[in-house]
Amino acid sequence: MVMRSVDLRSDTVTRPTDAMREAMCNAEVDDDVLGYDPTARRLEEEMAKMMGKEAALFVPSGTMGNLISVMVHCDVRGSEVILGDNCHIHVYENGGISTIGGVHPKTVKNEEDGTMDLEAIEAAIRDPKGSTFYPSTRLICLENTHANSGGRCLSVEYTEKVGEIAKRHGVKLHIDGARLFNASIALGVPVHKLVKAADSVQVCLSKGLGAPVGSVIVGSQSFIEKAKTVRKTLGGGMRQIGVLCAAALVALQENLPKLQHDHKKAKLLAEGLNQMKGIRVNVAAVETNMIFMDMEDGSRLTAEKLRKNLEENGILLIRGNSSRIRIVIHHQITTSDVHYTLSCFQQAMLTMQEPSRT
């Protein structure tokens, strides 16, 4: 029987801390759909202040937060949004911007670092004079950090250049900042500088920050007022959400300072894995709390076989594809867990790569 468990599937797997549970039990609450929950107001005001925006809104999930933002900016059905071909909104959010929002996605290739070529973004913007034949571009979306690129960070300079393109063409800029605080810590830049160019931002509370539930979207006061209506339409209006927001307020105080340690542990794990025969990790690309580990070409191993072997020792992982495993560090992973994980990997690699005896 496995006694030790090291859950590296995602930073969404964390359990509420004792301080969070206490805050949730004692949270001051009211009906948030009617706009009276005081703890929700505290969280929204704090997030708006941190992001340098006028207002904020608690939403049940990052997927809903992104969908609401796209629908507010693209309020004419058939509008077009420009976004990366490997971004979360396009790949992992069930096509909601199209099926629910009536918004047409136009993809631009994501580079290895999560950026999109600036010239390609500008070239993708439709000429309004041709709107009889194709959709009107109303929005550009960025993702920071970029999950499918391994948690890579978009710089202030890059984001501002995209913002300049958006303004030049009269379109809006939305940032999917599910792990925005990770980018802030990694780059050593306050979050408000990372999103200054954006008209709206979605920030997840249950990923790096480790709260149990929810996301927040921020933007102008008029944007948030429209977002409230869309949230209600999508079924995202909830009553006494102060119970959830109380945990998020604790997360901002308790876990935000821990993100730098998550990044150090991710780098430590990546460096150790990269020294093992049969495994390849681009250590330089490990900028935050995420690691992509690939099986070397010609290896007898598959990601799924390795994942199952490690699971027997309590190491929980998600397979990216047949030759890739994704690893995500969070605040409940200790340095001891990292060393234990490396020892389990080392043992698995030795036993699984041994030639079969006939």
From Swiss-Prot:
Enzyme nomenclature, EC number: 4.1.2.48
Gene Ontology terms, MF aspect: L-allo-threonine aldolase activity; threonine aldolase activity
Tissue: Expressed in root tips, seedlings, carpels and seeds.
Pathway: Amino-acid degradation; L-threonine degradation via aldolase pathway; acetaldehyde and glycine from L-threonine: step 1/1
Reactions accelerated catalytically: L-threonine = acetaldehyde + glycine; L-allo-threonine = acetaldehyde + glycine
KO phenotype (gene knockout): No visible phenotype under normal growth conditions, but mutant plants have 50-fold increase in seed Thr content and 2-fold decrease in seedling Gly content.
Domain of life from the UniProt record: Eukaryota
Enzyme class, UniProt record, top EC level: lyase
Residues with PTM N6-(pyridoxal phosphate)lysine: K207
Lyase recorded as keyword: yes
Cofactor list: pyridoxal 5'-phosphate
GO biological process: threonine catabolic process
Keyword Nuclease: no
Alphabetized UniProt keyword annotations: Lyase, Pyridoxal phosphate
Cysteines engaged in disulfide bonds, as pairs: none
Family label: Belongs to the threonine aldolase family.
Function as written in the Swiss-Prot or TrEMBL entry: Threonine aldolase involved in threonine degradation to glycine. May play a role in the removal of L-allo-threonine.
Identification of the protein by name: Low-specificity L-threonine aldolase 1
Organism: Arabidopsis thaliana (Mouse-ear cress)
Gene: THA1
